[in-house]
């Protein structure tokens, strides 16, 4: 098994057939349980890896072929990748998990870490082969995922910010107003600052997220 690229929180290894994801950090057990539950419920409805086995801190998943969204984005395919990310996100947000989703409070299944960072695509067709990394999934406002995908592009792929129009076109709705998106980005950054603070109080991760909060707060539409 070799360590898989683009894992940012946990320890994820694979051999081309299966993937072992071992959860690290605060709430590791709950995040593993959450990811397992969502993957099981979404199987056959959204492209997600199959769950083969669940141990206390590890999930064994089927390996899904595809190229990581961030690699394809940097290879010059930003419009196609972001359009596919938008279309896949719409499918996620219209899933009815149980009687509570789609209820009149407007909450949907929020992925919780959505963006080209957690999507694999077929490099020939740009079809999404898998949406990965459901450990932060919850019921919430669709803007959370819309804003976070935008944040990933603004922070890590600033040359492609203009292609976010393809993301919203793929999703099929005009972008929510900028102040609402920016507030959602800042809320998520603060939640991640808090997560790193619980993991290693006063550590590099905390400083990193504080810096990112300052940067995000300075952005204009
Ligand atoms: N089922 C899978 N098939 C193929 N690659 C995977 C699979 N699961 C994870 N990966 C690869 O491992 C990386 C890290 O997995 P992920 O669930 O995103 O963990 P993390 O929470 O650490 O980001 C992914 O970005 C992807 O490149
Ligand atoms: Mg990930």
Give residue ranges: language-model regions.
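A glycine-centered beta->alpha junction motif in the catalytic cores
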Residues: 24-25, 57-78, 91-97, 189-204
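Active-site Asp-x-Gly
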Residues: 124-166
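Helix-rich C-terminal or lid/interface subdomains of diverse kinases
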Residues: 9, 56, 66, 148-221
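Short beta-strand micro-motifs within the conserved protein kinase catalytic domain, predominantly
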Residues: 50-58
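Conserved kinase catalytic-core helix
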Residues: 42-46, 69-103, 109-112, 117
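ATP-binding glycine-rich loop module of kinase domains
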Residues: 2-33, 40, 71
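Active-site beta-strand-loop-beta-strand hairpin of nuclease catalytic cores
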Residues: 14-18, 121-129
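Non-catalytic scaffold residues of the protein kinase domain
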Residues: 9, 45-48
